[in-house]
């Protein structure tokens, strides 16, 4: 077996609309292509020995053990690799259940599709599954050592790229509210929402977190001073820079016991509490100095009581947790080392922040804390004796939490909310020491020890005891108050031909509203009139540029088949999805071999439309019209024929449609007709002589209308939109050169050639074509381009693209010539492979009042060449 290619899908895609995170592994079975599993000695027995948990896979039989029954009866290796890849992820806690395996048009080569949780781990699982299955084929076994290494690697990959627990809590709540989100950086900054409505979080810092409040919270001494000046109880303390000042500082705060900690520490690192004599103070100072970047050490009075963390969000208390330091409880027989090992076996404990709780790590701090209690790692604890392993109660060092939200006294609630406002934090974690949180701090001699920016949520979301608290909900309530949108209107456009023109027209229409419009196209990414990036930008990365931009109010996204197949969509849903047509282009690429398969690719756009939105479908294209059966949204149709049965049936059901009737672009709904504009007054239709441009206008007008735009705005948009080289480069760009005209169009498939041909056939004068085609198209497609050219043009020059796309020089041209001669053996043609030379010759030799039509590889170069020619009177 050999992996030929691996794709990672991150959005709705060809294989599944709902399951966005999929690996597509193109697998060559090689010598196993004709060997089902029941013909491989020992394979079934080895598989259930190595992965007995595969018994839980139902597969097509639909019951426990169903997949293993398929293996025993005989199934092919691609199918088995799919299930093994899923199970390897399951064994490390990454539950992924969806899979598909389909043979391609090349015998023995399969697309193995399976779900993933973590991208890197998902790709690794596929490679490991192939290794495992190959080993079982060759030897009947796969060592448990190798399996454990695979699982360990999977865990590591997942842990390295996983979101932190607090971030995970927030994005899970965002998912529940259907607020879209995306990662912005490796530091786990997350964007919530799209465009102008976006908010950002990093851990539990948010777009609302003020820099002054965060900086103040990081300055422990400054925080204490501000709180003290506000009359809020804080520990008596001082800050020193040198060891020589330590003894005096202890005396200044009232003597022992004291707390010694770094000024700039976090997560409890470098802190020693309840320091009771000089030797302990020396050790505590050294520990704090190791963790301090500034050399500044805080010495504070130690206050008896329990450690509490109070969470305040947007000025309101939302949760309280009592924190217990890492500890073990004796059973009368086990050593402390053994008790720690038993504690760490708790499935809720993981490394770092990987789980609800953190495993207890034995380090110098733990040993020092034990020794202060009179124990060491080999000590056998009496039954029920508790030994603490950390001085502080941070969950990140193995502590646990008990929910106390319902216990806190109302006066303390008021005080904590005041603390957050005094410091200036939108999300504040306030550390309180008090003997009883249910009583006012003034009665218990309690104090505010610290105020933290970016507080952790684990202790509140999953306390060891007490009620879990959904603390992410108030965060999202703050970022997106009731009635505040998180999304911007998204209009997605796909099809074989006309995508770019329709996208640009839609964007132009929306600009009439005064909104900031971002759009992607084959030519470039634009925000309003400003070009962000030139080039083919019709994939998910380009769409994400628009969705990430904080100025964009409306997104119009040209969406080509390549991006859908390669990575899925950048968005989970859209408001309007336009499918213009499906034609025989790009067939044979990406395992899309039939026009029906291509229709399934394009259908993704229609299927992701939100139920409240509209799928705008071409009623004149049966493959597109049939997509309505899969759509969950409302449907609106457009047609060049008002009598189209699909249109008539739709209107009878009070549906909305756009049609070309009596020379007008009109919108129909039920019994009424709304005429948007006469086609001859829409510049892009070339005076009504370009039917395919009228169809594009119908689609754009209908999309804008169903998304709520006023007809007057739409009318203004179509009246002022032109097919100039500046506004729509490569889309019916007509140049008047005085003695003759030149037309530039990026058509590169038979349907596109026919559409341009419908316009060219009406030209009164010589029709001179400079024709070519992409080398990666099928032979039959290139031959058909030649046939169409022979039908349309009086004279033809056949040229080739510089990028041969896998063909040898002259091969593409030969196929086009073959089509020309099949259609018209006496056709006037010649072959000039260089595009520039070919176009120059056509421009030099075209007859007066003639039309030169070029289908260029480089639109910009062709336009530049034509513009350089001065009009000849």
Curated annotation (Swiss-Prot):
Enzyme class of the recorded protein, top EC level: ligase
Subunit structure: Homodimer.
GO terms classed as biological process: biosynthetic process
Catalytic activity annotation: [L-4-(L-arginin-2-N-yl)aspartate](n) + L-aspartate + ATP = [L-4-(L-arginin-2-N-yl)aspartate](n)-L-aspartate + ADP + phosphate + H(+); [L-4-(L-arginin-2-N-yl)aspartate](n)-L-aspartate + L-arginine + ATP = [L-4-(L-arginin-2-N-yl)aspartate](n+1) + ADP + phosphate + H(+)
Similarity comment: family membership: In the C-terminal section; belongs to the MurCDEF family.
Family annotation (PANTHER family): CYANOPHYCIN SYNTHETASE (PTHR23135:SF18), MUR LIGASE FAMILY MEMBER (PTHR23135)
Residues that coordinate or bind ATP: 495-501
Start and end residues of each ATP-grasp domain: 224-480
The enzyme's E.C. designation: 6.3.2.29, 6.3.2.30
GO molecular function per UniProt: ATP binding; cyanophycin synthetase activity (L-arginine-adding); cyanophycin synthetase activity (L-aspartate-adding); metal ion binding
UniProt-listed Gene3D superfamilies: ATP-grasp fold, B domain, Mur ligase, C-terminal domain, Mur-like, catalytic domain
Lineage: Bacteria, Bacillati, Cyanobacteriota, Cyanophyceae, Synechococcales
Function according to Swiss-Prot or TrEMBL: Catalyzes the ATP-dependent polymerization of arginine and aspartate to multi-L-arginyl-poly-L-aspartic acid (cyanophycin; a water-insoluble reserve polymer).
The name this protein goes by in its record: Cyanophycin synthetase
Cited Pfam families: Cyanophycin_syn, Mur_ligase_C, Mur_ligase_M, RimK
Keywords, in A-Z order: ATP-binding, Ligase, Nucleotide-binding
Keyword Nucleus: no
PROSITE patterns per record: ATP_GRASP
Family annotation (InterPro entries): ATP-grasp, ATP-grasp_RimK-type, Cya_phycin_syn, Cyanophycin_syn_N, Mur-like_cat_sf, Mur_ligase_C, Mur_ligase_C_dom_sf, Mur_ligase_cen
């Amino acid at each position: 077996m050999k992996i030929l290619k691996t794709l990672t899908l991150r959005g709705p895609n060809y294989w599944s609309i709902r399951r966005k995170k999929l690996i597509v592994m193109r697998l060559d079975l090689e010598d196993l292509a004709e060997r089902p599993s029941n013909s491989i000695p020992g394979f079934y027995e080895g598989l259930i020995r190595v992965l007995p948990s595969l018994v839980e896979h139902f597969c097509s039989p639909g019951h426990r053990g169903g997949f293993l029954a398929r293996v025993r009866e005989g199934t092919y290796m691609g199918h088995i690799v799919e299930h093994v890849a899923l199970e390897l992820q399951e064994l490390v806690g990454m539950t992924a259940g969806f899979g598909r395996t389909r043979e391609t048009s090349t015998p023995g080569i399969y697309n193995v599709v399976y779900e993933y949780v973590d991208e890197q781990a998902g790709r690794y699982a596929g490679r490991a599954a192939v290794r495992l299955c190959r080993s079982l084929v060759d030897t009947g076994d796969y060592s448990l050592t190798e399996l454990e290494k695979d699982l360990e690697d999977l865990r590591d990959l997942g842990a390295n790229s996983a979101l932190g627990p607090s971030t995970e809590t927030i994005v899970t709540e965002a998912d529940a509210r259907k607020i879209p989100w995306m990662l912005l950086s490796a530091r786990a900054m997350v964007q919530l929402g799209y465009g102008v409505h976006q908010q950002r979080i990093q851990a539990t810092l948010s777009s609302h977190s003020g820099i002054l409040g965060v900086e103040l919270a990081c300055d422990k001494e400054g925080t204490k001073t501000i709180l003290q000046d506000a009359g809020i109880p804080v520990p008596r303390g001082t800050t020193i820079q040198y060891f020589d000042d330590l003894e005096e500082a202890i005396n200044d705060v009232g003597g022992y016991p004291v707390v010694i900690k770094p000024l700039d520490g976090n997560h409890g690192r470098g802190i020693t509490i309840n320091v009771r004599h000089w030797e302990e103070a020396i050790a505590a100072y050294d520990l704090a100095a190791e963790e301090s970047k500034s050399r500044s050490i805080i010495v504070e009075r130690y206050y008896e009581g329990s450690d509490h963390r109070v969470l305040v969000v947007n000025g309101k208390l939302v949760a309280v947790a009592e924190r217990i330091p890492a500890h073990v409880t004796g059973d009368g027989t086990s050593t402390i080392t053994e008790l720690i090992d038993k504690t760490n076996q708790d499935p809720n404990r993981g490394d770092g922040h990987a789980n609800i709780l953190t495993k207890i790590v034995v380090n110098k701090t733990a040993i020092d804390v034990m020794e202060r209690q009179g124990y060491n790692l080999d000590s056998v604890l009496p039954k029920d004796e508790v030994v603490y392993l950390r001085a502080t109660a941070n969950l990140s060092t193995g502590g646990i939490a008990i929910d106390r939200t319902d216990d806190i006294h109302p006066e303390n609630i008021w005080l904590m909310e005041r603390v957050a406002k005094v410091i200036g934090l939108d999300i504040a974690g306030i550390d309180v020491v008090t003997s009883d949180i249910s009583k006012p701090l003034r009665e218990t001699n309690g104090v505010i020890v610290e105020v933290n920016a970016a507080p952790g949520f684990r202790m509140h979301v999953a306390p060891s005891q007490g009620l879990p608290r959904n603390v992410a909900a108030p965060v999202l309530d703050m970022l997106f108050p009731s009635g505040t949108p998180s999304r911007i209107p998204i209009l997605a456009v796909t099809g074989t031909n006309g995508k770019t023109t329709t996208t640009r027209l839609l964007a132009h229409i929306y600009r009439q509203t005064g909104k900031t419009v971002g759009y992607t196209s084959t030519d470039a990414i634009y925000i309003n009139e400003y070009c962000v990036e030139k080039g083919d930008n019709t994939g998910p990365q380009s769409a994400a540029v628009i969705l990430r931009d904080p100025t964009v109010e409306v997104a119009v996204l040209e969406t080509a088949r390549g991006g859908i197949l390669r990575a899925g969509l950048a968005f989970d849903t859209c408001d309007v999805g336009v499918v213009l047509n499906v034609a025989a282009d790009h067939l044979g690429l990406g395992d899309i071999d039939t026009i029906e398969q291509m229709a399934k690719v394009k259908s993704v756009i229609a299927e992701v439309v939100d139920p409240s939105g509209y799928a705008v479908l071409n009623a004149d294209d049966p493959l597109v019209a049939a997509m309505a059966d899969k759509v969950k949204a409302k449907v609106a149709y457009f047609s060049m024929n008002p009598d189209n049965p699909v249109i008539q049936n739709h209107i009878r059901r009070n549906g909305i449609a756009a049609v070309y009737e009596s020379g007008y672009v009109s919108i129909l709904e039920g019994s009424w007709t709304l005429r948007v504009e006469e086609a001859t007054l829409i510049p892009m239709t070339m005076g009504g002589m370009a039917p395919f441009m009228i169809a594009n206008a119908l689609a754009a007008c209908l999309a804008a209308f169903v998304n709520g735009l006023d007809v007057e705005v739409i009318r203004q948009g179509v009246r002022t939109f032109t097919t100039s080289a500046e506004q729509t480069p490569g889309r019916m760009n007509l140049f008047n050169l005085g003695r003759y005209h030149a037309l530039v169009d990026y058509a590169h498939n038979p349907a596109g050639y026919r559409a341009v041909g419908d316009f060219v056939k009406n030209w009164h004068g010589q029709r001179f074509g400079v024709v070519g085609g992409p080398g990666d198209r099928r032979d039959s497609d290139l031959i058909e381009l030649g046939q169409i050219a022979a039908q349309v043009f009086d004279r033809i020059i056949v040229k080739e693209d510089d990028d041969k796309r896998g063909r040898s020089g002259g091969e593409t041209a030969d196929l086009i010539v073959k089509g020309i001669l099949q259609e018209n053996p006496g056709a006037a043609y010649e072959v000039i492979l260089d595009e520039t030379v070919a176009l120059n010759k056509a421009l030099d030799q075209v007859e007066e009042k003639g039309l030169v039509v070029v289908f260029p590889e480089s639109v910009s170069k062709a336009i530049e060449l034509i513009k350089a020619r001065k009009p000849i009177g």
